[in-house]
């Protein structure tokens, strides 16, 4: 292997810097009725025209418009407490989430869904993560959202079915009453 790879750190996105316009808006505390340019992005990226996530969002017209049913916040950096926008560690943000999705194609274990349930946040994962397989074994069945962890069956050939299962689970969770959601949070923590 080349020595150049030994000196580099691989990161989720090629982050340039936190967005100053977003920082100013957040600091002002004022409600705004006009979106920022690139309203779904928290940090500027180097070579944004080559970023696969941004390309995907453009292809599917994901712009966080008022009538859009799906809103996206793309955070392309590690949440280490010093990112310039949130300035909170990942775990401090995780506890404020209602539901997490880790649609792993393959992870020997998959710590992120485990971390989610440890903080009482229900999650959706797949049977291709070790954690998903463990949950199924623990429950004696495929995990369902009402168990605190939904384990979606994933193969090399069922991407559409996986996407539909995730969509259906998120929609179902959004329809739960606060009492039902709280019960599911406790079940997630029990796992």
Which positions does each model-derived feature cover?
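Generic recognition of flexible, low-complexity loop/linker segments
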Residues: 58-62, 88-90, 111-113, 137-140
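Short, flexible/disordered intra-domain loops and linkers
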Residues: 6-11, 81-85
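Short, small-residue-biased leader/transition segments that mark boundaries at the very start
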Residues: 1-5
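Intrinsically disordered, low-complexity cytosolic loops and termini enriched
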Residues: 8-23
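Catalytic binding pocket for nucleotide-activated donors in carbohydrate/polymer assembly enzymes
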Residues: 99, 103-186, 190
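Donor nucleotide-activated moiety binding/catalytic core segment of transferases
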Residues: 69-107
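Long, low-complexity, polar/charged, intrinsically disordered or flexibly structured peripheral segments
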Residues: 24-85
């Amino acid at each position: 292997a080349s020595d150049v790879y030994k000196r580099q750190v691989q990161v989720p996105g090629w982050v340039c810097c936190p967005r100053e316009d977003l920082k100013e808006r957040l600091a002002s505390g004022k409600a705004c009725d006009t979106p920022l340019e690139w309203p779904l992005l928290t940090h500027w990226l180097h070579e944004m025209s080559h970023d696969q996530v941004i390309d995907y969002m453009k292809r599917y017209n994901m712009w966080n418009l008022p009538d859009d049913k799906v809103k996206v916040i793309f955070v392309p950096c590690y949440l280490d407490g010093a990112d310039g926008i949130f300035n909170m560690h990942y775990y401090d943000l995780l506890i404020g989430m209602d539901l997490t999705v880790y649609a792993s194609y393959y992870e020997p274990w998959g710590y992120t869904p485990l971390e989610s349930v440890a903080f009482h946040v229900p999650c959706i994962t797949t049977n291709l993560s070790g954690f998903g397989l463990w949950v199924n074994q623990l429950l004696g069945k495929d995990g369902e959202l009402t168990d605190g962890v939904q384990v979606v069956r994933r193969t090399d050939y069922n991407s559409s079915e996986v996407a539909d299962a995730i969509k259906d689970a998120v929609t179902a969770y959004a329809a739960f009453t606060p009492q039902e959601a709280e019960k599911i949070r406790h079940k997630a923590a029990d796992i």
